[in-house]
Every structure is written in C-alpha cells, then in structure tokens.
C-alpha cells in the first residue's frame, strides 16, 4: 500500500519528480512532495507501469567453449565500494554514467570461452545496458524514480534500492543537426579479427541515418594523422561510404595525432546549437607520440570546453586498451561503448542514434542523502570511478556526466536499517546543466520505508533485472559482498525473466550469458 502526499508547487517550473514504487504489477506509483528550492522544479506526477504478460519459453541452449589464448588487454581495478555508516556520512554523491562498454566486453569474453577479468567489470555499465522501463517524463527534462525490496541474496535485513534517472525523449526527426567527425584508427592492430571491417560496417549504419542537415568529416590515423574527408553534407551517403570503404590497415598507432587533428577539424566545422561530436573508433592501442589518457586529453581539453562532445567506440580483443577509451570518454564529455557484433553497432548507431548524438544534460550528478535515524549503513554498488566529493555536489566547476536524449541511468544501493525504524530513507537529488542555456537545475524527492516492497519475487520485473545484472557483475568482479552468491543461483533467479519480459531480446541474451558464465565457471 502506498501513501499519497500533497503536491508541492515551486516558483519556477522546470522539471518533474516522481519516485516509481513498483511493489507489483498492480501497484500504483506514489506521488511525492519535494522540498521547495528556488532553482528546483516542484511539481509531481503519477505514472502507471504494467508488467509484461508471461509466456512460456524453453531454456536457452549453450555450446561448449574453449579457453582463449592469453591476451594483453588493459583494464583498471577501481576497487569495490564498502558499507558506510549513515551516522558518520549520510551523503553519497556520484556523476551519472550511461556507458555500456563493460557489459559488451564481458559478452565478448564469454564468446571466446572465458570469464572476463575482474578488473574489466564496472557494475553500473551492466545495469545501464538494459531498458529499465522508467516512464518518459512528459514535457520536462528528467524524472527521478526509485523502488526497493529485501535482498534475495542476504538474510540479514538488507534491502536493495534502485534509483533511476530518466531523460526526456526526442524523436529522430526532431533531433538537432549533427556535425560529426569520425576519427578512425587504421593502425596495424586494426587488421586483427577484421576490426577495421567491423568499424566500416558500423559507421555505414550510422551514415545511412544522416540527412542533409548533418555534416560528416573523417580523420584517420596510423603512424600519422590525415584528413580523408572534408566536411560533407550528411545526405551524400555514397561519397561518405566510399571513403569509409577505401580505408585499410597501416602501421603504428598515433592516437594523440588522430584525436588532435579530429578536434581541429571538428572546430573548423563547428556550428553553434548543433550536436558537435567526435566519434573515435579504435582498439585503444597507442604506441607513437603521447600514449596515456592524461597526455592525450591535454592536447584536446580546450576543444572539449568549447562544446565538442566525444564518443569512444571500442573494437577488438587481445590487445584492447579499455583504460584509455573509458578515460577519454569520461573526461571528453562523452560516452563509451564497445562494439563486438553488428547487433551492438545497430543498437548504438541506429536504435539509440538520438541518444548517442544529442546531449540534454551536462555535468549531471546525483546526491543521495540518507536519514541516519532510519538507515544504519548503506553501500553504492558500482560507480567506483565516478565518485564526486559530497561538498562538490553544487560546485558546478566539477566535471560530472553527460546524458543524451532518452537516456536513463540507474544506481543500486544495498541498505541496512536501524531496528524497527520507519520514515524517510533518503532524499534523492539530481543536478545538471542545460547544454543550450547553461542554466543549472536541481530536482529532488523522498523515498520512505513504507514505499518498500515486501519481497523480491513480487517486484516489477525491470527491478529484478537491474538487481540481477548488478549482482552478476558483483560475482564476476569477485566482490567480497557477493562471496556467497553463485552464478548458478543467479541463473535460477534470472530464468523467470524470460516469461515476465518476453519481448526484450537483451533480457533473453542476459539469461543465456549468465548460464554460459555458470558453465565456464564449473
């Protein structure tokens, strides 16, 4: 049973807050009152969410796999967040992240017959890979949603909270014109596994979606960098694709020179009010010039501040540099994806094209203010390398995350309560900068003990998916907080999702991947 609160209206109408409390398919979301702040939206709406109908599906089949050859892939271990006593630190602050590369990297490892390295796993990228089913906020920028239930893995009263941010959607035909600069790695390493061939086919999918209002330029780099296509109208598909088709692998890898020239070309073609973006396609290998992310970023930082965004797209495995690609995206005001199949390329460049190209929020960050009278301790599962100092939540000079149109971002918290405590669990606050007006907005809302579900089994299937994805990542990265959770247990819990979310191909693949990981682990 969910309690309704009175609507609180503020002075400036900017956005909507709603906390989605899905106890079961029939449960109605709660209306939430928000604290009045001068720059904050103060209106509340109620949304209805229905669970998909169940259908019968067979268990997915798995093929025997062989162990892969040793590799020189580069990943970084960011550690695992500990529990924090709410009485000692009641604030949890992090930059939003919509990257999904870590999940795709895992899939590639499983296809090659081995579990992914623990350091390659970033929990939030597993969770954010999936559609969370949040309602799109009507005629406003963002909605905040939350739900929670007892953990299916712990029997000590631990509850798992899902906190979601959903941005407004823009139809593809209404998106801003895009000024795109492709920076393509044509070094010798891109000849392996036909990496360059996958780059070509991926970019061709993107080019087919462009129109006369868009502009495309292309820079390639091996030992040196050069421009192979000057700014060209996006509807010149044949000309653009002919240049892409003509590319072939060359020698060493000077990523610094490629990005520097790419940004220079992007700046020359820059159009105020357009989506100005550099798209880097590479395996991340850099062995000529400056090779580290800090040194490379130093060469292009000025262009980033001018409003040129960066998308890094990783290809290949065996000598893949995940560290470089992620750091470039994080510090380049962008996003990071890994393409291992044409299906993944279609997801990035066709299905999510507007989300990929058009930014609706800059420096977006979340602060969760836990109530020490109710919460004994809490743990943010993931976002280890996206932490923001609590005192910097309202410091708008601190870099945070960018969200594209229709993007959502989700965080999972493990929470333990004080005995018999009831009331407000936390206040969830979102702060972001409008990329067009540069105005800073902030919205917030409360989540309470009476909003919790009584059991994991009766929660919304999308909540269950988010929790299972998070714990799948926890097991793969060997988190001490999931030491007693097995892949077999996760597979058993995941199988019902085939019936509750029958139309979602990503869910079916997830169940299959969990089963495959369990087989490999035996």
Region locations from a protein language model:
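Exposed acidic/Ser/Thr-rich ligand/metal-binding surfaces
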Residues: 28, 143-364, 418-422, 435-437, ...
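Intrinsically disordered, low-complexity Ser/Thr/Pro-rich tracts
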Residues: 1-70
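Residues that line or immediately flank small-molecule/substrate-binding pockets and catalytic motifs
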Residues: 23, 98, 282
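An acidic, Ser/Thr-enriched
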Residues: 62-109, 114-120, 138-143, 153-161, ...
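Generic structural signal of hydrophobic/aromatic residues within well-ordered alpha-helices
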Residues: 126, 130, 240-244, 349, ...
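Short, well-ordered alpha-helical segments
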Residues: 124, 197-200, 466
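Periplasmic polypeptide-binding modules associated with outer-membrane biogenesis and secretion
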Residues: 128-133, 145-149
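Extracytoplasmic
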Residues: 115-132
């Amino acid at each position: 049973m969910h309690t309704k609160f009175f609507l609180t209206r503020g002075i400036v109408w900017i956005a909507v807050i709603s906390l989605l409390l899905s106890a079961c398919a029939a449960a109605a979301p709660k209306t939430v009152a928000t604290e009045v702040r001068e720059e904050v939206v103060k209106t509340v709406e109620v949304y209805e969410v229905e669970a998909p109908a169940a259908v019968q599906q067979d268990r997915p089949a798995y093929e025997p796999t062989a162990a892969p050859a040793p590799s020189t892939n580069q990943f970084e271990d960011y550690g695992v967040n500990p529990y924090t006593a709410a009485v000692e630190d009641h604030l949890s602050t992090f930059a939003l992240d919509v990257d999904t590369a870590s999940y795709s990297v895992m899939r590639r490892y499983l296809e090659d017959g081995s579990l992914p390295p623990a350091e390659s796993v970033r929990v939030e990228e597993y969770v954010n890979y999936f559609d969370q089913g949040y309602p799109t906020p009507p005629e406003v920028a963002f909605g905040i949603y939350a739900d929670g239930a007892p953990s299916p893995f712990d029997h000590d009263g631990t509850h798992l909270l899902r906190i979601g941010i959903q941005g407004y959607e823009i139809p593809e035909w209404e998106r801003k014109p895009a000024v795109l600069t492709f920076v393509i790695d044509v070094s010798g390493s891109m000849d392996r596994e036909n990496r360059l061939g996958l780059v070509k086919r991926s970019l061709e999918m993107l080019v087919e979606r462009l129109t006369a209002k868009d502009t495309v330029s292309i820079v390639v780099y091996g030992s040196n960098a050069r421009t192979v296509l000057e700014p060209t109208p996006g509807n010149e598909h044949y000309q653009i694709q002919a240049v892409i088709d003509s590319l072939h692998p060359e020698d060493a890898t000077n990523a610094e020179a490629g990005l520097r020239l790419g940004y220079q070309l992007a700046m020359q073609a820059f159009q105020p009010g357009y989506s100005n973006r550099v798209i880097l396609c590479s395996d991340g290998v850099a062995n000529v010039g400056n090779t580290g992310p800090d040194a490379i970023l130093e060469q292009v930082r000025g262009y980033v501040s001018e409003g040129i965004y960066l998308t890094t797209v990783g290809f290949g495995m065996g000598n893949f540099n995940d560290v470089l690609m992620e750091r470039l995206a994080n510090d380049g005001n962008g996003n990071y994806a890994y393409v291992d199949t044409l299906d993944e390329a279609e997801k990035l460049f066709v299905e999510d094209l507007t989300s990929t190209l058009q930014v609706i929020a800059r420096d977006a960050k979340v602060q969760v203010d836990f109530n020490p009278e109710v919460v004994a301790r809490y743990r943010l599962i993931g976002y280890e390398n996206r932490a923001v100092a609590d005192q910097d939540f309202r410091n708008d000079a601190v870099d945070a995350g960018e969200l594209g149109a229709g993007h959502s971002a989700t965080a999972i918290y493990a929470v333990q309560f004080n005995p018999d405590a009831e009331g407000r669990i936390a206040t969830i606050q979102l702060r972001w900068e409008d990329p067009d007006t540069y105005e800073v907005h902030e919205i917030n809302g409360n989540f309470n003990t009476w909003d919790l579900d009584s059991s994991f089994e009766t929660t919304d299937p999308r909540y269950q998916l988010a929790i299972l994805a998070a714990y799948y990542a926890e097991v793969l990265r060997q988190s001490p907080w999931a030491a007693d959770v097995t892949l077999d247990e996760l597979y058993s819990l995941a199988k019902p999702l085939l019936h509750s979310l029958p139309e979602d191909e990503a869910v079916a693949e997830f169940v299959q991947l969990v089963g495959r990981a369990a087989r490999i682990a035996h």
